[in-house]
């Protein structure tokens, strides 16, 4: 015994050596960087903190679907980086409220309203319209862009049509309401034309700066309301150009001090040649092939800044304005070079530089801003900071087309965000965007939106079915059921799809693939639920709930499901946050069970009126309240809370289909009746008379009424005679059948 214990002491057991599993490298986020035109690994400069600047709108008109393309797409990207990849994102966006377009539009609106308030006499209005048509015609003749030319021609034609009735009224010396009505029509049709003319003649007299701030303030508010309606998160900080003029002046001064800017006639220009010749810098990082494109450069300078005298101030045509000396009729701010206003490109550089410093992680904007705007932003900022890395990742959202065409007022396909939201919900628009790559062209069309609507309906039906399954009563332990092969297989597919979705998000936030993987996962769940239903077995609640919660979580990340935005703890303590579904569903369940009991008795007692009332409750009353009852033979009624408008559309569609079926049935019955009537009419004809009326074909007949000669008097061939004989015999049979039916009284 002692020997045995001693032996055990010498051979004491120890833990075996452990080795970690080989594992796989985690997938890393890659983003398409316009600076390299490749997908690059995303590495923020400061741990998980991400600094992000997004070019905001120039606010002088209603926001349109082109704006939605950028801001919904960037909202999705921002949410994914923040809520999925857990980056600490600081998101900055600007509002451009000083710009050539704003100045011109504000001036024109002000002058036109002044003109309208003076209530010009009809003769004076006609004279002014004719005066305005002269420069307008010159502009029309000089326009080469076909879309713009078409729009101008349409304006000219509308003005000419509106002019004729007023001219006739003046010539006829009419007065009163009829003339006033013609005046109002012409004023409305000639608004653009008169505004241009008034601006060219009186624009230099507009000196009140408040006129130039009123317009952008109105349209900025309109833009924010549109973004809220689209469920686009507000920026962490919003910068307005008008609030950063001192910072812009200092920014311009330092660029001049660093040797990359020069003063000319009170304006300051960026010296592109000096910058490009520096070993530390590169000009045209984003679109080097566009450097020197004068058309693009002039568009970037603005309509009020490309006159011959302005262009002559530059050392090189490629140089661009950092600061513009204000001309009469333009807003101005004091600066070392005289009164002026900021150039377009410098505004973003100064505001972003002030808040984000010498180097930011992400800069975003629309694809059409790459050159000259973003290339000039980069040049200015790197000239200011004397570095070569002002932006680490430049992201550009793709274009938006309307049914395959460029969106344009001239093509009459200009769609504002408000117009789009009248047709589709914010969620449906976002789903359409999610089903496309954020960096590629998105075609906003009926087909695109129909796909989004079907996707929404597909997901919603799944969520409603899972909710119905989860409402089935089980005790506390019954919710944890033993898994069979079907559950194990579905769970494996679930985790496979989660992996695929993660890889897709790492691959340049590929939401298009994510949406397809989510669709495939739901399809697998639907097959599982159908299989369980077929064998009268309840699906596994916990597994389906996990999958539904995951899908809901992803949709929340994408902004397709709104988050609860309440602050702090819920009112009333834990577990008291109100939910419409949790509140009303018990009552609806009681109503459903009561209705099932009533229907059962009505069927047993054969009371069709009760069944009709029950159907009316399901089909007509409950949809108005956003409630859907789904009856299944031999199974409990499924209760679903659905958007009221969706149910009403479904009801209308059901009625339309039923009406079509009714019409088709009536049409088939009518055709059948006509065929029977035609057959009966044919049966009534004695065979001896069937050919006698065809005198255009035959000229002679035998004693039985059979044709013997054609219309030219030639005897019929044996083949023709044989064919007619067969027809005769067939009619003879029909006629006998008719006589028999008449004798039996088979028809009236």
UniProtKB/Swiss-Prot annotation:
L-cysteine binds at residues 56, 96, 373. The keyword Protein biosynthesis applies. Its cofactor is Zn(2+). ATP binds at residue 409. Keywords: Acetylation, Aminoacyl-tRNA synthetase, ATP-binding, Chromosomal rearrangement, Cytoplasm, Disease variant, Dwarfism, Ligase, Metal-binding, Nucleotide-binding, Phosphoprotein, Protein biosynthesis, Proto-oncogene, Zinc. Zn(2+) binds at residues 55, 348, 373, 377. It catalyses: tRNA(Cys) + L-cysteine + ATP = L-cysteinyl-tRNA(Cys) + AMP + diphosphate. One of its GO terms (biological process) is cysteinyl-tRNA aminoacylation. Residues 653-679 have a biased composition (Basic and acidic residues). One of its GO terms (molecular function) is cysteine-tRNA ligase activity. Changing residue 341 to H: In MDBH; 50% reduction of cysteine-tRNA ligase activity. Its main location: cytoplasm. It is an enzyme of class 6 (ligase). HAMAP family: Cys_tRNA_synth. PANTHER family: CYSTEINE--TRNA LIGASE, CYTOPLASMIC, CYSTEINYL-TRNA SYNTHETASE. Belongs to the class-I aminoacyl-tRNA synthetase family. This is Cysteine--tRNA ligase, cytoplasmic. It comes from Homo sapiens (Human). The lineage of its organism: Eukaryota, Metazoa, Chordata, Craniata, Vertebrata. The gene is CARS1.
């Amino acid at each position: 015994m002692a020997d045995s214990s001693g032996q055990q002491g010498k051979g004491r057991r120890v833990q075996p050596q452990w080795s970690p599993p080989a594992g796989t490298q985690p997938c890393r986020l890659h983003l398409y960087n316009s600076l390299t035109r490749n997908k690059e690994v995303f590495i923020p400069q400061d741990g998980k903190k991400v600094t992000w600047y997004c070019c905001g709108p120039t606010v002088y008109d209603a926001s349109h679907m082109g704006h939605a393309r950028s801001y919904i797409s960037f909202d999705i990207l921002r949410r994914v980086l923040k809520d999925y990849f857990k980056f600490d994102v600081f998101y900055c966006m600007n509002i451009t409220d000083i710009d050539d377009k704003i100045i011109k539009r504000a001036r024109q609106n002000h002058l036109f309203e002044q003109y309208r308030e003076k209530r010009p006499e009809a003769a004076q209005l006609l004279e002014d319209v004719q005066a305005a048509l002269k420069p307008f015609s010159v502009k029309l003749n000089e326009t080469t862009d076909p879309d713009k030319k078409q729009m101008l021609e349409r304006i000219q034609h509308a003005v000419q049509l509106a002019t004729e009735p007023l001219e006739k009224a003046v010539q006829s010396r009419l007065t009163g309401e009829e003339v006033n009505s013609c005046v109002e029509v012409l004023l409305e049709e000639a608004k653009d034309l008169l505004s241009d003319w008034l601006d060219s003649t009186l624009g230099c007299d507009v000196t009140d700066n408040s006129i130039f701030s009123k317009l952008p303030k109105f349209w900025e508010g309109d833009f924010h309301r549109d973004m809220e309606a689209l469920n686009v998160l507000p920026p962490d900080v919003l910068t307005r150009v008008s609030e950063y003029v001192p910072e812009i002046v200092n920014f311009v001064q330092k660029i001049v001090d660093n040797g990359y800017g020069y003063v000319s006639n009170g304006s300051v220009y960026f010296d592109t040649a000096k910058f490009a010749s520096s070993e530390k810098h590169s000009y045209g990082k984003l679109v080097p092939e566009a450097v020197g494109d004068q058309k693009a450069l002039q568009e970037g300078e603005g309509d009020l800044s490309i006159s011959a005298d302005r262009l002559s101030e530059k050392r090189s045509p490629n140089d661009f304005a950092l600061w513009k000396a204000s001309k009469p009729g333009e807003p101005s701010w004091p600066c070392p070079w005289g009164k002026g206003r900021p150039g377009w490109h410098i505004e973003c550089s100064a505001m972003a530089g002030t808040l984000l410093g010498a180097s930011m992680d992400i800069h975003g904007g629309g694809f059409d801003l790459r050159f000259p705007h973003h290339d000039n932003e980069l040049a200015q900022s790197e000239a200011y900071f004397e570095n070569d890395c002002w932006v680490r990742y430049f992201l550009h959202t793709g274009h938006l087309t309307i049914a395959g065409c460029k969106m344009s007022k001239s093509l009459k396909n200009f769609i504002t965000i408000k117009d789009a939201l009248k047709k589709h919900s914010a969620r449906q628009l976002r789903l359409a965007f999610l089903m496309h790559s954020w960096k590629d062209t998105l075609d906003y069309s009926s087909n695109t939106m129909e796909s989004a609507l079907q996707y929404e309906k597909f997901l919603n039906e799944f969520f409603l079915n899972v909710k119905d399954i989860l409402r089935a009563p089980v005790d506390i332990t019954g919710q944890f059921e033993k898994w069979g092969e079907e559950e194990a297989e579905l769970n494996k597919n679930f985790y496979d799809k989660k992996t695929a979705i993660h890889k897709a998000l790492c691959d340049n936030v590929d939401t298009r693939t994510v949406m397809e993987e989510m669709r495939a996962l739901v399809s697998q769940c639907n097959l599982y639920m159908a299989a369980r239903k077929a064998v009268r077995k309840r699906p596994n609640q916990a597994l389906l709930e996990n999958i539904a919660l995951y899908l809901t979580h992803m949709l929340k990340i994408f902004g397709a499901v709104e988050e609860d935005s309440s602050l702090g703890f819920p009112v009333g303590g834990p577990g008291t946050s109100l939910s419409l579904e949790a509140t009303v569903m018990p009552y609806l369940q009681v109503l459903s069970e009561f209705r099932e009991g009533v229907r059962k008795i009505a069927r047993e007692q054969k009371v069709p009126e009760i069944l009709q009332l029950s159907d009316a409750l399901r089909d007509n009353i409950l949809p108005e309240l956003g409630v859907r009852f789904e009856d299944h033979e031999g199974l409990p009624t499924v209760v679903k809370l659905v958007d009221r408008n969706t149910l009403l559309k479904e009801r209308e569609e059901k009625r339309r289909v039923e009406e079509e079926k009714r019409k088709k049935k009536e049409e088939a019955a009518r055709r059948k009746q006509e065929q029977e009537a035609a057959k009966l009419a044919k049966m009534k004809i004695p065979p001896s008379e069937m050919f006698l009326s065809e005198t255009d074909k035959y000229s002679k007949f035998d004693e039985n009424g059979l044709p013997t000669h054609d219309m030219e008097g030639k005897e019929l061939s044996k083949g023709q005679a044989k064919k007619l004989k067969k027809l005769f015999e067939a009619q003879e049979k029909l006629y006998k059948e008719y006589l028999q039916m008449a004798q039996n009284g088979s028809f009236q």
